[in-house]
Amino acid sequence: MTLKDFKIILALLISALGFAQHNVSGTVTFSKTNTPVADVKVYDKTSGVLATTDNSGFFKFETSKKELTLVFFSFEYAVEEVTIETENASTLNITLKDLTQNLSEVEITARKQRIFELKRLNDVEGTAIYAGKKTEVVLVEQSMANLASNNARQIYSQVAGLNIYQNDDAGLQLNIGGRGLDPNRTANFNTRQNGYDISADVLGYPESYYTPASEGLSEIQVIRGAASLQYGTQFGGLINFKMKEPNPNKPLEVISRFTLGSYGLYTNFTSVSGTKNKWSYYSYFNYKKGDGFRPNSEFESKNVFAHLGYKFNEKTKLTGEITYMRYLAQQAGGLTDAMFNEDPYQSNRARNWFQVDWLLYNLKLDHKFSDKTNFTFNFFGLNASRDALGFRTNRVSQVDSNEERDLIKGDFKNFGFESRLLTKYKVFNKDATFLIGSKFYKADNYQEQGPASDGIGPNFDFTNDEYPNYGSQSQFDLPNLNVSVFGENIFYVSDKFSVTPGFRFEYIKTQSEGFYKNINTDAAGNVILNETIEDNQNFERSFILLGLGLSYKPNTNFEAYGNVSQNYRSVTFSDINIDNPAFLISPDITDEEGFTTDLGIRGNFNNMVSYDLGVFGLFYKKRIGFVTIVDTDGSIKNERGNIGDAVMYGVESLFDFNLKKIFNLNNNVKLNYFINTSVINSEYTNSEKAGVKGNKVEFVPDLNLKMGLNGGYKNLLANIQYSYLGSQFTDATNSIEASESGVVGEIPEYDILDVSLSYSYKNFKLETGINNVLDNAYFTRRATGYPGPGIIPSSPRNWYTTLQIKF
């Protein structure tokens, strides 16, 4: 081929691939006064923000699309929507109408829903790429949930396939999994608040002891396994709690919420918010206390959050946040199957306590280099502790001997920073978006286990001198270093079809430096050996994860998407360093790896039905779990280690029917029916453990169903929700009933009915509801450690009433 031939072919190829760019500009004015309106967001209904009007109401942007549905949004005006042909829209004149001030609660809800449809995770949000990914967003205020107690069953009712531990009647900890992932403290998700990490240690101890107050959240963003490239390697993906933002129209707004409920529940949530010139702020205090629905389960919690922002100019903003949470909870202990069947709410542990002290801090810089290039820098840190105290034995039914208690203390000190640069550019005259980012994370953690007092109260001091021969004693320093570089690029093959490849490079160094005691006794209980064994370990690895996403959007109401991304989960400190009488740890335990796939369609049909229907596959290598083994002394025990290879696959769907639109009801009425279904199958495809291959995977109910009816008339709103979860196993050997430990065995199927009601009048709002209306006795969790071990029952029928006052 000659150079001339090559040039001709290249020119033809570029010509075939390219398409014209169109310049769109215009002015936005107020209909009554014809004056320009500044700070109006101009949205493409399918891809997000295109421009913002300046002080003269002017906006402009460039697009390759031939047709656009534009939405113009400002907090102080009614939303305006227009469809344009871009070839003939070089200059637009848009007028915004005044927003009616006395909106009913139904009208406010409809407006928030419309705004949400504009803001929901588009292809690009800030310095993040979501194109081609399975994404879900929870509008917390519209969930009609029991927010005072963070009722996850209600809050996440329209997120497909989530498996939730429901044993905490105050919502102090969030325990959610899904697709066969252990829900324990949400450890299989990367959990963030406003984009930064909040767990104890992202890799070494990814458990979330802190959960933001739901009353302070605007939305919860859930991105499935494809989030492994941008946010962290976990199989579950990302859960990002997005806090409420400062009120942009007032210098001061105060909201106070008072809640009373069953079993001595009392909570108060008070927030202050406002904007003055270049400064903005949002802060809240949340207090909770209660007796719990079981004996020996009282709790008290205090949580403070503060956000302060300073806007230097239209291109640069600096924000700082600080979060502090402290709570003390008495733990009633676990049950065996026989104990649960006898009395599901009994307790034989009066000396077990749990204490958390959590301090988070964050500093974020947002800078816009140009209309096409954005940069963010996030600095974050954690200074926290977690203390677990109590009488533990592998025989859950054993009466407390009132001897010394077991104490596990964990101190977590870490910091990190994450920087992101996102830019929009052209490839062969076609739109493209490139994201590059890096993250540095360093943790210095400490963990100690040993004897504590033989008293009753929450005394979190060790008593090693008094009980030198206590069996479970250890001390470990646990430093951890993680450096990662990640990138994704959206290539718009056409104005309807995009391809998004991505990568993540990870360097992980986890260390364990310390000792444990080896203590042996004779048949009479006399100590014959008390030795200290040094145990120093160093795990260092580096790897690259790859992923690919596809998206097809023929119009504003339909999208087909697909994604495949690799995942990785490193062994945690609790996997290797904690002595637990309920199970053994395999000495050969190692990291998990695999990949996640998603394929689905989502959209809206004539504003009557919104839907998200998809299939998924989750493929594991060296999955960690429990298996029943025969120990060297001939006893039957549970061992935690790498079980083998596994696959989970299924269908997830969410349909939301707008009955108001279907039956042509007036604007004073709101009526929606939703059905959220997940049908999953699973199998261990390979295992060296006897009797495991071909078994079902743990935490995989065959059917996960939630349905509900949301309605309202003017200022009155109501909700009724039904939830059903099929039976599931908790160990790889698929045990049906556990031994005296209660740790492994089946979690039976259960169903729950919840109702809630709210009424608004001027600055007041009254909310009330009943959870578990039918008073079903059920459990969702077999705890391997605290708050058990054993079966942890879920709450019986309970009520709550909340009064909200807004100033």
Give the ranges of each region predicted by the language model:
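Transmembrane beta-barrel wall of Gram-negative outer-membrane proteins
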Residues: 260-289, 294-330, 353-371, 440, ...
